[in-house]
């Protein structure tokens, strides 16, 4: 990775910060897609055979070891396939706004069961839920709508198939990759996304940091 970084990312002073550029945006985008698909698994990065059949080598690992064995034994889950359906639904829609009603409809799992499973999946550090705020940075009393991110964007490729340039999921996967860099930060508990209506138009800001003392946004991406 260090060789790629040196070859593809250049930096130069710009006032008190740095300005970044690249000699080849096409190559940089290609490597970013490789990161989305395989970057979370060092064994895949270093082994073309695993990349060629990532679902077989890594997807079954996630399903068999974590979902079908570890979580059921930890939490006494009886209906393993129900948990599997919920997780695969979440993984496919990583980075998108969802609701308990929508999850129940798409996965076929009851809402009260979904609530428990979401807590289990978060405890296993497979997913992270992000709360919604309005255009002033205020949270809602009831979390009817929220976003769920995979903690590792490469899990989606392992469960389904690697994505390519132009795929519909590219935006959500890129968003998942950016959020994943914050998951170990102390700021994580203050990160949200903003969504509100302006007339008939839905507006959204993907990443908003809210000051917990003033309950006001301090920065956004």
Where does each model-flagged region fall?
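Accessory nucleic acid-recognition modules appended to NTPase machines
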Residues: 46-217
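Short helix-coil transition/hinge motifs at the ends and kinks of transmembrane helices
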Residues: 12-24, 137, 141
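A residue-level signal for conserved active-site and pocket-lining positions in enzyme catalytic cores
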Residues: 4, 39, 86
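Residue-level signal for well-ordered alpha-helical scaffold segments within enzymatic catalytic domains
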Residues: 3-6, 34, 65, 181
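Nucleotide phosphate-binding site architecture
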Residues: 2, 42, 156-157
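Amphipathic alpha-helical "lid/sensor" segments that cap RecA-like P-loop NTPase cores
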Residues: 17-62
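Conserved beta3 VAIK motif of the Hanks protein kinase fold
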Residues: 221
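Conserved small helical "lid"/interfacial subdomain of P-loop NTPases
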Residues: 1-16
């Amino acid at each position: 990775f260090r060789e790629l970084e040196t070859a593809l990312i250049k930096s130069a002073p710009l006032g008190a910060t740095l300005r970044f550029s690249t000699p080849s945006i096409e190559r940089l985008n290609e490597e970013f897609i490789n990161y989305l698909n395989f970057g979370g698994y060092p064994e895949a990065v270093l082994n073309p055979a695993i990349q060629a059949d990532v679902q077989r080598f890594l997807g079954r690992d996630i399903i068999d070891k974590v979902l079908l064995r570890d979580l059921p034994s930890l939490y006494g889950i009886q209906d393993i396939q129900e948990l599997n359906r919920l997780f695969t639904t979440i993984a496919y829609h990583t980075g998108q706004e969802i609701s308990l009603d929508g999850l129940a409809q798409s996965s076929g799992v009851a809402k009260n069961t979904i609530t428990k499973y979401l807590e289990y999946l978060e405890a296993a550090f497979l997913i992270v839920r992000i709360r919604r705020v309005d255009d002033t940075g205020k949270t809602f009393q009831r979390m009817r709508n929220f976003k769920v991110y995979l903690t590792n964007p490469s899990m989606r490729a392992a469960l389904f198939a690697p994505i390519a340039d132009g795929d519909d999921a590219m935006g959500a996967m890129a968003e998942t990759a950016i959020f994943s860099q914050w998951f170990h930060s102390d700021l994580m508990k203050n990160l949200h996304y903003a969504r509100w209506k302006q007339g008939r138009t839905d507006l959204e800001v993907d990443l908003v940091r809210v000051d917990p003392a003033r309950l006001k946004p301090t920065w956004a991406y």
